[in-house]
Amino acid sequence: RAAAGMATPTLEAARRGLPNTLYGVSLLHEGQVIGMGRVIGDGGSFFIVVDIAVLPAHQGRGLGRRIMAALDDWLRANAPPSAVVSLVADGDAKHLYAKYGFVETTPHSVNMEYQVE
């Protein structure tokens, strides 16, 4: 996460959270993880795409699309028809996500969060 410019959870948070991943993708190059993404949620009504990241040295090669395609395939095969799939799109990544059916929800709703201290 840090190498891709994303916030890094504490080791304890990662130990608790990662086992609850519904589906995850890791892209490897010469034994090193260079890209990742995962789906979390309740497994029925709500699914959230998180942790989409590709190392800067490997960006611009379509790897983000490969990650999203794998997650999208899994969601379409496993989520029930009434399920809602959401994500937070940073910057121009919204254009990638739009290719998989994601639409902006603003101004009807906005992303809100807080970090536990």
Language-model-detected regions and their locations in the chain:
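Conserved acetyl-CoA pyrophosphate-binding loop and the N-cap/start of the following alpha-helix
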Residues: 58, 62-70
